[in-house]
């Protein structure tokens, strides 16, 4: 999974897998990408700071149960 933020256009992108997609706009500024089997492969949210409550809220990112493995 890849999470990226483009501060120039204030867009958050979450990619679950890299593949050829069909994009469906589900609401103003929110798009969901589907793979050929209809499984969600990504999500894009525009105007993310406004949607999440501004800079202070957006800066607080919590990863739960991600299962990160650290190299020894």
Predicted regions span which residues?
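Small, basic N-terminal interaction modules of short regulatory proteins
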Residues: 1-72
